[in-house]
Swiss-Prot record:
UniProt note on regulation of activity: Phosphorylation of the N-terminal regulatory domain activates the methylesterase activity.
This protein's record includes keyword Phosphoprotein: yes
Domain CheB-type methylesterase intervals: 152-344
Catalytic reactions of this protein: [protein]-L-glutamate 5-O-methyl ester + H2O = L-glutamyl-[protein] + methanol + H(+); L-glutaminyl-[protein] + H2O = L-glutamyl-[protein] + NH4(+)
Taxonomic superkingdom: Bacteria
Enzyme class: hydrolase
This protein's name: Protein-glutamate methylesterase/protein-glutamine glutaminase
Limits of the Response regulatory domain: 5-122
Annotated EC: 3.1.1.61, 3.5.1.44
Effect of C309A: Loss of methylesterase activity
PTM-bearing positions, type 4-aspartylphosphate: D56
Molecular function as annotated in GO: phosphorelay response regulator activity; protein-glutamate methylesterase activity; protein-glutamine glutaminase activity
Organism: Salmonella typhimurium (strain LT2 / SGSC1412 / ATCC 700720)
Length: 349
């Protein structure tokens, strides 16, 4: 089997050296070239035709985002961004994902060499996922039409969403059309600390419903979406007649924290047939067992179809496990969620 050919673009010679060491330490991939800036990278891409590009977000000669935008328009290819953990870094990284980057890795704040080498397996996994991802020429997503507002739903109803690679844009596409009368939405997206808050703030500006990073103990309200904080598990809990959010530091599940399975199992337990579950694009199997539990508890469950996924891993696993009520294109997910939950949704026999 041929190796995954990687090209790394970073203005730091140390980072280029470390990325080369990491990539070449895995037998199924090789670093074919490195570039100190996007202008040099442009020529190297033509020369080496890499399978995956790793791209530093912040560079002096040409902004990484400008380069990414041109690249995705003219020569779409899988890109993994390398970002700092600063607030600005998280905003720029989210913009990169919007422009078509597949995923990102964060640079450690101290001890770059030791930190990056400790991330070696994670970086290799992201490169492998990117090499398999579905890439299309970047077309800015049209602002979705707001769905017709139905009657304000009971606070018993709620929607639970899980996603990983490719999920930030898929979640945006699902949340933007939701009217203020929507039920509560609780979301687990695999993402490190610092990025989930920026992600929630960005969505809050784009959506009619309120979007925020979830906090432990807060009440779950209709017309609001709650995003699991990075490196914490989020569960649905009960407080009398109300739902509330529980945030905790439990061990990783399916190697993830936050884990979609943790969220979905809690929704199955506390919301049952009053919930709709949605599993979107992502690598691996996180969420499949939890979605089956939701399905068995009477919830309507939706998986994103392969054609609209960046990576079809998580939806495929959920479908194979038998816990999916229907498989729909990303463009139809919002509509189906609301249709099922408004109809009292527990219409499965």
């Amino acid at each position: 089997m041929s190796k995954i050919r990687v090209l790394s673009v970073d203005d730091s010679a140390l980072m280029r050296q470390i990325m080369t060491e990491i990539i070449n330490s895995h037998s199924d991939m090789e670093m074919v070239a490195t570039a100190p800036d996007p202008l040099v990278a442009r020529d190297l891409i033509k020369k080496f035709n890499p399978d995956v590009l790793t791209l530093d977000v912040e560079m002096p000669r040409m902004d990484g985002l400008d380069f990414l935008e041109k690249l995705m328009r003219l020569r779409p290819m899988p890109v993994v961004m390398v970002s700092s953990l600063t607030g600005k870094g998280s905003e720029v990284t989210l913009r990169a994902l919007e422009l078509g980057a597949i995923d990102f890795v964060t640079k450690p704040q101290l001890g770059i060499r030791e930190g990056m080498l400790a991330y070696s397996e994670m970086i290799a996994e992201k490169v492998r996922t990117a090499a398999r991802a579905r890439i299309a020429a970047h077309k800015p997503m049209a602002a979705p039409t707001t769905l017709k507002a139905g009657p304000l739903l009971s606070s018993e109803k709620l929607i639970a969403i899980g996603a990983s690679t490719g999920g930030t844009e898929a979640i945006r596409h699902v949340l933007q059309p939701l009217p203020l009368s929507s039920p509560a939405v609780i979301i687990t997206q695999h993402m490190p600390p610092g990025f989930t808050r920026s992600f929630a703030e960005r969505l809050n500006k784009l959506c009619q419903i309120s979007v925020k990073e979830a906090e432990d103990g807060e009440r779950v309200l209709p017309g609001h979406a709650y995003i699991a904080p990075g490196d914490k598990h989020m569960e649905l809990a009960r407080s009398g007649a109300n739902y509330q959010i529980k945030i905790h530091d439990g061990p990783p599940v399916n190697r993830h924290r936050p884990s979609v399975d943790v969220l979905f199992h809690s929704v199955a337990k506390h919301a049952g047939r009053n919930a709709v579950g949605v599993i979107l694009t992502g690598m691996g199997n996180d969420g499949a067992a939890g979605m089956l539990a939701m399905y068995q508890a009477g919830a309507w469950t939706i998986a994103q179809n392969e054609a609209s996924c960046v990576v079809f891993g998580m939806p495929r696993e959920a479908i194979n496990m038998g816990g999916v009520s229907e498989v729909v294109d990303l463009s139809q997910v919002s509509q189906q969620m609301l249709a099922k939950i408004s109809a009292g949704q527990a219409i499965r026999i």
